[in-house]
A protein has these predicted regions:
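Bacterial N-terminal signal peptides
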Residues: 12-25
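Bacterial N-terminal signal peptides that target proteins for export
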Residues: 2-13
């Protein structure tokens, strides 16, 4: 499995400038109140209509250097070439398109019946073909690492270690369990499950905590989104330092750009970062975003130009709502948001089960 990560990193480094340019940040103006009118002001324009399922099966990234995108805009399919030029796709018949009916280079999209990492769709023009290089909509197509030694052994070793000290002073920790604030918060804690990049649980409990000011800000975000028909689905929040150490030790050298350095700690370790998405209040189901949670591909960029209009709209709505209450997005991960006061808190290393027992968390710090 490590080879998949290595291959993917090479693709990221070779990402064309047109995609990188399209992913530059575009910041939203904060909103202040949770009234219906204020909630409406968070909307990133009119809500687009969804697209046919067959379109979603082919919309994505193609080419080993991520040189081609198929995307949807205004209920039309577009082909974006390696120079960043968008061309509208005109259907000829099943799986066949052209960009110019008068002088048609035929674009063929092959969609296998069984989609797997070794059997992916490909796009062909003349004698050139580009395989699809993102995991589509299936979390089973993630890139994984196979740590040696296994996660259980890495956890045993990490729990014996002490986080690095930092100059203080810091605020006293006040970790708050998010779901206790409102039933509108739902949990899907991936690192307490097997469907994560390690293919193994790292947490012993599926719980989510944040420092109280951050948790209360997140509650205000939820109250702004609820009138619009959305709730918040939490994937991760406070992360004990030993888990960051596990991630670091489990990841091969070429993959460490995707994980936090335990010698520096992370915003998750401070209880001031949260990984989350939207869910539909009517169905209870997560909404579709341009990419999947924890996906190691350009679809994770906060301003990735691909996907469908509705997927981008949902992603931008989440960002606008979070930024309105003092959170900032990680530009490489549309789901990751940091609270504005994170520098005021030190690194914590209290496991979830000890928080439940009332163990007071302490930052590992010293005064200068």
């Amino acid at each position: 499995m490590i080879s998949h990560v290595s291959r993917h990193i090479r693709l990221i480094l070779a990402l064309p400038l047109f995609i990188l340019a399209s992913c530059l940040p575009a910041f939203a103006a904060p909103q202040a109140h949770a009234s219906p009118s204020a909630a409406d002001s968070l909307l990133p324009g009119p809500k687009p209509a969804d697209v046919p399922f067959d379109w979603k099966r082919i919309i994505g990234i193609y080419g080993k250097d991520h040189s081609v995108l198929l995307l949807e805009r205004d209920q039309e399919l577009f082909y974006r070439d390696s120079t960043g030029v968008d061309k509208k796709l005109i259907p000829i018949n099943s799986g066949m398109f052209t960009t110019d009916p008068n002088d048609p280079p035929v674009i063929k999209i092959n969609l296998p019946a069984a989609y797997s990492l070794s059997n992916v769709p490909f796009l062909g023009i003349s004698d050139k073909t580009w395989p699809r290089t993102d995991p589509s909509d299936n979390p089973g197509h993630f890139y994984h690492v196979s740590p040696a030694p296994p996660v259980a052994e890495l956890r045993r070793k990490a729990l014996k270690l002490t986080p690095p000290t930092e100059p203080g002073p810091f605020r006293e920790p006040d970790l708050t369990e998010i779901v206790n604030l409102d039933a509108g918060f739902h949990l899907e804690i991936r690192y307490a499950r097997y469907d994560n990049f390690l293919s193994a649980p790292v947490y012993t409990q599926a719980r989510a905590f944040m420092q109280r000011p951050a948790a209360e800000a997140l509650l205000r975000v939820l109250h702004k989104l609820q009138p619009l028909g959305y709730g918040l689905l939490i994937h991760d929040a406070y992360r004990p330092w030993y888990v960051t150490k596990i991630f670091w030790d489990a990841t091969p050298p070429e993959g460490k750009i995707f994980v936090a350095d335990p010698q520096k700690g992370s915003k998750h370790n401070r209880g001031c970062a949260v990984d989350l998405t939207l869910y539909d209040l009517a169905t209870g189901q997560p909404v579709e975003m341009p990419g999947l949670y924890d996906e190691m591909s350009p679809r994770s960029f906060a301003n990735f130009p691909g996907g469908t209009s509705l997927q981008r709209w949902h992603r931008d709505l989440l960002r606008r709502a979070m930024e309105s209450e003092g959170f900032s997005v990680n530009e490489d991960e549309w789901w990751h948001f940091d609270y504005k006061d994170w520098k005021q808190y030190g690194i914590l290393n209290v496991p979830f089960e000890k928080i439940a027992l009332g163990v007071e968390p302490k930052a590992v710090s010293h005064k200068p």
